[in-house]
Amino acid sequence: MTSRLIKSIATGLGLLGNQASAEGSYNGYEAPPYQVEREVGGAEVRLYQPHLTAEVTVKGAQSQALRRGFSELAGYIFGGNTTSASVSMTTPVTQRPSEKIAMTTPVTQSGDGDIWTVSFTMPREYTRETLPVPNTDTIRFVETTPERQIVLRFSGIAGTAKLAKQDATLQAIAAQAGVSLGAGPFYYFYDDPLTLPWN
């Protein structure tokens, strides 16, 4: 799935008759709750609720960075923390190009295509204060704010070319619908890497 933050939406786009919402789970795994506000040319405008994430910034090609980021975060939730506690697996794994961040924060990087931020959603039972402390300082916790995103779902093997094609499709849908885009793209990976591409 690919998505982008929304700056503004042209008036005249109707809301769905019965606004759809996600209960905050996917295939038995906890996921960030959202509400579908509109359908736009095969995409959905979603309002995501605030949630807590653990994230790392990694350098490399898209697929390599995803594997490295996933591995580091999986190590954390499977006990790579000061209390050796396990944290429940959630979905999705999120990947996005890193953006320039003010010098006062720990990570400053331009989104030149080889610097990526990979994140896991943390279970709702935790706060920043109650999560186990990571064994590494490369993992940071981020509390998201409500975010309106335009989202395009797709299946299959999500290689770099396919992700770029889906993002271009999403941008075209948004432009045609008068949706002004903000940050992105965000890539959401919901299924295990061993899931067959036609599932």
Regions found by a protein language model. Name each.
Residues 2-199:
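A solvent-exposed interaction/effector surface
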